[in-house]
């Protein structure tokens, strides 16, 4: 169903030239060197790239299964990869600290997803939760709010998937 051995890449776009100096500064506070290392672990190795390489080698009985992967599994694996790299000492001390911020983001994203779609969470409440409790820059939080409004349950996949990966790890260790 899918072509084998296709080339892949991962890139991080710089902030647009049209942004103000203040907005660019905020972007670089959020996407600092340590965040970019964590993001690379998540998006590339051993995160999405590794998982999808294995997934693409799986020969499914149906085209539907081959084309539509599990978002919970995909994001769960990538966030678990971040966690494992930090647990095993990858990078400077700031990398595990950044990973803890990302772990907090997983939890807050799931809360926002649920509360928005089930309890009527307002934009102001969500922004406060993300910026004050989650230490996210305002621009990042605003983008996350738009994402939450435009999709239901996607932001929760990271947290739910991570919980399941950790549950499986615990079972394997027993």
What does each model-found stretch correspond to?
Residues 1-174:
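Long, His/Glu/Asp-enriched segments that create or flank divalent metal/ion-associated functional microenvironments
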